[in-house]
Amino acid sequence: MTTASTTSKDGYTFAGVLLLVLGAFNLIDGFMLLDRSELFADAYVFSNASTWGWILIVFGVCQFVAGAMLARGSGGRTMALTLAGIGMVLWFMLLFTFPFASLIGTAINFSVIASVLSTDPN
C-alpha cells in the first residue's frame, strides 16, 4: 500500500498561517476594546476593557511574529506551542464577553497545537 507523503513543513506552514490569523484577530479585538472600552465596563475577568485591549494587542503581535517564523520555516515551534496554549486560556477568559469569538479562537488555537505536535520536527 502506498501512502501520500507530505513534507514535514506542511504542518508548520498550516500552523503558522493559523497563528497569523489569530494574531490579526487579537489585534482587531485589542484595538476595538481600546476604542470602545466604555461599552464593556464590567464584563471582564481580573481587569477592565482597556487593560484587556493592551494585553490582546501585545499578544497579537507576539502571535503574528511566531506565525511568520513558523510559516517561513525558521523555527518557532516552542514559541508557537506556548502562545497557542496561552491563547486558549486568554480566549477562555473572554468567554462570557465574546462567546462566539472565544469558541472560534479556542478552536483555532487547538488546531495550531494539534498541527505542530503532529508534524515531525526533523
Language-model features, listed with the residues they occupy:
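Membrane-interface extramembranous regions
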Residues: 2-122
